[in-house]
From Swiss-Prot:
SUPFAM superfamilies assigned: Acetyl-CoA synthetase-like
Organism (species): Methanothrix soehngenii
Lineage of the species this protein comes from: Archaea, Methanobacteriati, Methanobacteriota, Stenosarchaea group, Methanomicrobia
Highest taxon above the source species: Archaea
One GO process term, biological-process aspect: acetyl-CoA biosynthetic process
Protein name (record): Uncharacterized protein in acs 3'region
Single GO MF descriptor: acetate-CoA ligase activity
A Pfam cross-reference name: AMP-binding
Record-linked InterPro entries: AMP-dep_synth/lig_dom (IPR000873), ANL_N_sf (IPR042099)
Amino acid sequence: MPEPTDQPTQKITYAQLEKEVNKFANGLKSLGVVKGDRVMLYMPMIPQLPIAMLAIAKIGAIHCIVFSGFSSGGLNSRIMDAEAKVVITVDGFYRRGKPLPLKPNVD
């Protein structure tokens, strides 16, 4: 889970960003994601979100962002409407100091 908002900020260099984007793009390719595929992002505002967006763009796929407050039903309808090939999420995150799970909504 991402750390609570009272934690120090995380900084990365452009070189680190490029490395992370390339690793993520290669991971997507290994899942069979190709140019034109839609990839659903069901994540809070964490550093991995822009990394995922850049990796998706790098391979020519299309990212679709879904608000992390949606329930499993709301998420499912958006996945179907977008015809997403892959859904990327996190275990959970903190909102207003309370942990909120996300992965169970995808499962």
